[in-house]
Swiss-Prot record:
The gene is SCPL31. Keywords: Carboxypeptidase, Disulfide bond, Glycoprotein, Hydrolase, Protease, Secreted, Signal. It comes from Arabidopsis thaliana (Mouse-ear cress). This is Serine carboxypeptidase-like 31. It is an enzyme of class 3 (hydrolase). PROSITE patterns: CARBOXYPEPT_SER_SER (PS00131). Expressed in roots, senescent leaves, stems, flowers and siliques. InterPro entries: AB_hydrolase_fold, Peptidase_S10, Ser_caboxypep_ser_AS. The active site is at S198, D413, H465.
Length: 492
């Protein structure tokens, strides 16, 4: 999900879209970063990051590591990761980097402990439960809190936080990978994938492009450094602002969240392909009406009861971003909506990760000088300084480069709904390889799937924004299919 607040609506929401220049993939040269104060940890000493004695952790046979990797020595910038080895054959199985969106939301708080990690946060943040559908059954899983300012990731230079945007985030994530592989050289040759959901629909292809370009440049320049990137996996992803907005509105109307009249006004007054759309007061008011209706339900899972009193939900709907704000950007930008699923588990995660014993065990702090961990950083969200309006050109580039791209969508998500994703993918005009069909898991229809030349798209029937929260078993099966490159079964 910039530093843009537009009249009325831009402060009522904040969101899917911005309209800045399409970033070119930056070329980043991997150089070894030396340690700096806090944390004082050698890049090669991964054993110092081995997690032992995590409070409430179930007994497991695999190893996991957590800690900081520096990405800018001079500015004192470091990123926090949590890495889970595959449950068996970790040296042979793929390595998958998982990113959550926001921008400003934690992949540790969401992906690792609410969705696909082996330890799910317990009720009231008292401990952890083993996840029988953890994705490290199939791969080594690396969770990164990105960019700095998210979760435990930090910078000692305050001006860094004013630069946060897509380009900055992709560069830092690539530098993180370079330095992380110095810590874990045994995984340098593993096949590598990047996965994520929501606003990571921007992060993932942008980072993949940086990796892809640097691999090619390193090869031309005779460098031996190479990240073995094979593909990307995207869940309910923000993709192309114009199509995402249109799909967001059409989904709300087709699922009876908004009235015919509201839909008609938006259709008539909102040109989501135009930079000037948000200067239209009638459009702003109609879009605000959509948000008003979504305020009453869970936008991330429209048929799920809301968590009354949930802090993340309250901060989203009731904070300053949802009220008028006197700051008007000189360049009108579209509003943004916070990404990430917000059930009561958000509060439990906040309690758990602010415990002194947990932070010490994860090497996030010394257990005395505690970090103030939050699942989403609203300052990052409100001050994002550059978002790619569409990553579809990156899709085209990666497809041409032979990388695997799979996209999935939970069909009860109102935040980045299935219609938005279908509109975005249709804009690519890819040839259809296999026609629309159901796909099955445990003899039941899990969703529908269509294969294009270079891309596979699937839906999850009855799943919300964070698909693995709703369909853990079928999402694990789908993940396994993605890694194999073979679509899930077309019959019972």
């Amino acid at each position: 999900m910039d530093n843009y607040q537009t009249k009325n609506i831009s402060n009522l929401l904040t969101s899917l879209c911005f309209t800045t220049l399409l970033i070119l993939a930056p070329v980043v040269i991997c150089t070894r970063q030396h340690r700096f104060d806090s944390p004082k940890r050698s890049l090669l000493a991964n054993e110092q990051d081995l997690v032992t004695g995590l409070p409430g952790q179930p007994d497991v046979s695999f190893r996991h590591y957590a800690g900081y990797v520096p990405v800018d020595e001079s500015n004192g910038r470091a990123m926090f990761y949590w890495f889970f080895e595959a449950m068996d054959l970790p040296k042979e199985k793929p390595l998958v980097l998982w990113l959550n969106g926001g921008p400003g939301c934690s992949s540790v708080g969401y992906g690792a402990t609410q969705e696909i990690g082996p330890f799910l946060v317990d009720t009231n943040g008292n401990g952890l439960n083993f996840n029988p559908y953890a994705w490290n059954k199939e791969a080594n899983m690396l969770f990164l809190e990105s960019p700095v300012g998210v979760g435990f990731s930090y910078s000692n230079t305050s001006s860094d936080y004013q630069k946060l945007g897509d380009d900055f985030t992709a560069r830092d994530a690539y530098t993180f990978l370079c330095n992380w592989f110095e810590k874990f050289p045994e995984h340098k040759e593993n096949t590598f994938y990047i996965a994520g959901e929501s606003y990571a629909g921007k992060y993932v292809p942008e980072l993949a492009e940086v990796v892809y370009d640097n691999n090619n440049n390193n090869k031309k320049n005779g460098s031996s450094f190479h990240i073995n990137l094979k593909g990307i996996l995207l869940g309910n992803p923000e993709t192309s602002d114009a199509e995402d907005w249109r799909g967001w509105v059409d989904y709300a109307w087709s699922h009876a969240v908004i009235s015919d009249e509201t839909h008609r006004i938006i259709t008539r007054t909102c040109n989501f392909s135009s930079d000037n759309t948000w200067s239209n007061d009638e459009c702003n008011e109609a879009v605000a009406e959509v948000l008003k209706q979504y305020h009453e339900i869970d936008i991330y899972s429209i048929y799920t009861s809301v968590c009354i009193g949930d802090s993340a939900r309250s901060s989203y709907f009731d904070s300053a971003q949802f009220k008028t704000n006197s700051r008007i950007s000189s360049k009108r930008m579209p509003p943004r909506l916070m990404g990430g699923y917000d059930p009561c588990l958000d509060d439990y995660a906040r309690v758990f990760y602010n415990r002194a014993d947990v932070q010490k065990s994860l090497h996030a702090s010394d257990g005395v000088n505690l970090k103030n961990w939050s699942i989403c950083n609203m300052e990052i969200f409100n001050n994002w300084t550059g978002s790619n309006p569409s990553v579809l050109p990156i899709y085209e580039k990666l497809i041409a480069g032979g990388l695997r791209i799979w996209v999935y969508s939970g069909d009860t998500d109102g935040r980045v709904p299935v219609l938005a994703t279908r509109y975005s993918l249709n804009a690519l005009e890819l040839p259809i390889k296999t026609a629309w069909r159901p796909w099955y898991h445990e003899k039941q229809v899990s969703g529908w799937l269509q294969e294009y030349e270079g891309l596979t798209f699937a839906t999850f029937r009855g799943a919300g924004h964070a698909v693995p929260c709703f369909k853990p078993s079928s999402s694990l099966a789908f993940f396994s299919a993605f890694l194999s490159g073979v679509p899930p079964p077309p019959s019972r």
